[in-house]
């Protein structure tokens, strides 16, 4: 969490290797492997996933074809149609997503909530080691937020990690975070649990700045 301009989205971009961001110092390690020099696609194959704030629309490409192609690209393994289709339907039902969405063109005509649910479906299919959700709750009403983040909670396991970037405390109604980090001026200034979120909701980020002399 952090105020506008704190560097939250920049952190996400650095982790996935977005070309508009440059890492000037330090190391990025994934399972003890330094990945500083890896390109975006190479990091994706290593297991890093980024959910976009504003997912792209691609006419002519169905959700199912997109996901099957992405799975093949990430794993390097052929995904046979019927087996993949059956697995996809099972995942969609688990996430309370209408299986008919699989035949729709990617994000075309989707509501904001449907686009975000589709991002979570991508997570379920690709099974990343590190999933970064950059303000996935942005623009969602409470009902859509509930559906999306209950889906996120279902995908959390002991074998993966999730970095959830948000401005708002409402997502924590549906998630149980291991840690809450506060980012200000490009660095983590405070770490704790849900009590930090409650303090921010009550007093704002100014209280943290004051307490830490920032």
Residue ranges of each PLM-predicted region?
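Walker B catalytic motif
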Residues: 132-136, 143
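Helical segment within the ABC ATPase nucleotide-binding domain
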Residues: 145-158
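Conserved beta-strand-loop-alpha-helix hinge in the C-terminal portion
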Residues: 174, 179, 183, 187-209
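ABC ATPase NBD Q-loop/coupling interface
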Residues: 27-43, 107
